[in-house]
Amino acid sequence: MTSQINNEFLSLDVLPKHIAVIMDGNGRWAKAQGKPRVFGHKAGVDAVRKTISAASKLGINAITLFAFSSENWRRPEEEVSVLMELFITVLSREVKRLHKNNIQLRIIGETSQFSSRLQKKIVEAETLTSENTGLVLNVAANYGGKWDITQAVRRLAYQVERGNLQADDIDEDLIASKLTMSDLPEVDLMIRTSGECRISNFMLWQMAYAEFYFTDQYWPDFNEQSLADAVAWFVSRERRFGCTGEQIQALMNEKDQ
């Protein structure tokens, strides 16, 4: 039987260090309102802001948002085009806000497939925030977990081919060192919105020991309270004692003062 804990015993030490989020349900959210899918993608940007703000207030080390998977290229061309333009617009508009809040932005994925215009924006945004020491915000764009593992193994294969590495020396730690986000803690909490219960080729290696939290909320409806509820669930799972979203909100407020 679990017991409710007092706020004084709830510290930042029990919170997840790295949260991954599959932002799902933009299209269905828009459809429910009689709007085109792109309307949902634009509304989802506000949910991103709220989630980043909440994670930063809680002192989370890193948060990784699944913005565009390598499979998303199969969507209708018009929708993909709108998503790319939205990505450019959001990067241009939000990067100064991120920088002001000491947030370091990283774009992970096969970015070479993006337009030169978008690649330039990515480099500019990452460069501006590269020295920031607060929350690390990873945006997974044209990313897939299989791709990440493949590129890591390929890099090691090149080293073996050149005679700089023996095949027998390859172990889990060496592979992990070649993955994206290798300098960050492994994911301990994965959140997926919209009621879907799958990980969709997202961070397959890094989420090996993560707790999975699924919510029926569509992504545009996700907010600070939503993240607080997910983190409270994580604390209850990890520490085997009761925790509420209100307690997590109280921690946010303490950080905000």
Curated annotation (Swiss-Prot):
SUPFAM superfamilies cross-referenced by the UniProt entry: Undecaprenyl diphosphate synthase
Keywords of the record: Cell shape, Cell wall biogenesis/degradation, Magnesium, Metal-binding, Peptidoglycan synthesis, Transferase
UniProt xrefs under CDD domains: Cis_IPPS
Active-site residues from the entry: 24, 72 (proton acceptor)
PROSITE patterns registered for this protein in UniProt: UPP_SYNTHASE
One Pfam family hit: Prenyltransf
Annotated Mg(2+) binding sites: 24, 211
Free-text remark on how the cofactor is bound: Binds 2 magnesium ions per subunit.
Binding-site list for substrate: 25-29, 37, 41, 69-71, 73, 75, 192, 198-200
Xref: InterPro entries: UPP_synth-like, UPP_synth-like_CS, UPP_synth-like_sf
Cofactors, names only: Mg(2+)
Example of a GO cellular component annotation carried by this entry: cytosol
Catalytic reaction(s) noted: 8 isopentenyl diphosphate + (2E,6E)-farnesyl diphosphate = di-trans,octa-cis-undecaprenyl diphosphate + 8 diphosphate
HAMAP family per UniProt: ISPT
Subunit structure: Homodimer.
Main function: Catalyzes the sequential condensation of isopentenyl diphosphate (IPP) with (2E,6E)-farnesyl diphosphate (E,E-FPP) to yield (2Z,6Z,10Z,14Z,18Z,22Z,26Z,30Z,34E,38E)-undecaprenyl diphosphate (di-trans,octa-cis-UPP). UPP is the precursor of glycosyl carrier lipid in the biosynthesis of bacterial cell wall polysaccharide components such as peptidoglycan and lipopolysaccharide.
Protein name as catalogued: Ditrans,polycis-undecaprenyl-diphosphate synthase ((2E,6E)-farnesyl-diphosphate specific)
Gene field: uppS
